[in-house]
Amino acid sequence: MRQFNLLLVFCLIALTALPVFSFPNGLTMDSIDMEPMGAFDENGAADESPRVKRYGGWGGRGGWGRGGGRGYGGRGGGWGGRGGGWGRGGGGRGFYGGGRRGWGK
């Protein structure tokens, strides 16, 4: 069982790193202007677009901050939030977990 858990963690880390390897050659972080996209806008937490509903955003509805929702950090699940787990609905067995659901349910 321990080996399965290690394999699962390794796979999740590998999947997280995939976008790094698929970064286009001619594109650099300096050439990307994030402000017109509204990526760091204060109202981004209240955005109700399908992308934010699904992936969380940057803090309001999940994301990597506090908030809630389904991202990598808010109440709803992820690393460091109140919910725990890697999923939508909260905790179960997450690193900081304690909710009713776990692991993507």
Swiss-Prot record:
Keywords: Amidation, Cleavage on pair of basic residues, Neuropeptide, Secreted, Signal
Subcellular location: Secreted
A GO BP annotation: neuropeptide signaling pathway
Predominant location: secreted
Residues carrying Tryptophan amide: 64, 86, 103
N-terminal signal peptide: 1-22
Keyword Signal: yes
Entry-annotated residues carrying Glycine amide: 59, 68, 73, 80, 91, 98
Residue ranges listed under propeptide: 23-54
One annotated Gene Ontology cellular component of this protein: extracellular region
Family listed: Belongs to the YARP (YGGW-amide related peptide) family.
Function per UniProt: May have antimicrobial activity.
Protein name from the UniProt record: Neuropeptide-like protein 32
Native source organism of the sequence: Caenorhabditis elegans
Lineage, opening ranks: Eukaryota, Metazoa, Ecdysozoa, Nematoda, Chromadorea
